Amino acid sequence: MNDTATVGGKGASLGEMFQKLSGIGVKVPNGFTLTTAAFKQFVEAEIPETTWNNIGAPEDIEELRNAAINCSTLASALEVCLRDADPKDHLNLNSRASLARSLVRETPVPDEIKLVIAQEYSKLCELYHPGVDVAVRSSATTEDSADASFAGQYESYLNVSGEQDIIEKWRRCVASMFTCLLYTSPSPRDGRISRMPSSA
């Protein structure tokens, strides 16, 4: 069964190796992956008004920030950040990417996703030991596609311990997808938000 479309390449490969190799004595660390459905739930969540109190914007995109404030969901605000971006204007792209990353980092993670992370991390603690360290990495479905490769351009976090830290690092993994704006031409998916699962 190919799960790449829902958990990305890294997540699918880790699951396959654990299932096939653990039984024959090859040590493969267990883990879990938040799916594209979790990513969708996060970006479709409403943005609390107070979120914007911690988000500034460079002068060259102040109007863009004001337009994004009127959006009800994270996804729609992010699409405003990306829309009509000029891939040749690197300074403007950098400002847009910075605004998008700040927005993701400040938007609360839905309670349902927090619960899933807590439950899955608890299973790893039972399997290994309490407070076990994990790596939080992107497993994006678009990292290595037929027309683009973003491998190594998203953030990875090592030695992460505790459910709260995992939640924060997952959110930062999501935010890091907007660092790749500078490497894409034209703007990523023409302003549409791609799917990013993440693995721990």
Q: Predicted regions: what is each one?
A:
Residues 187-190, 194-200:
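Positively charged, low-complexity/disordered segments
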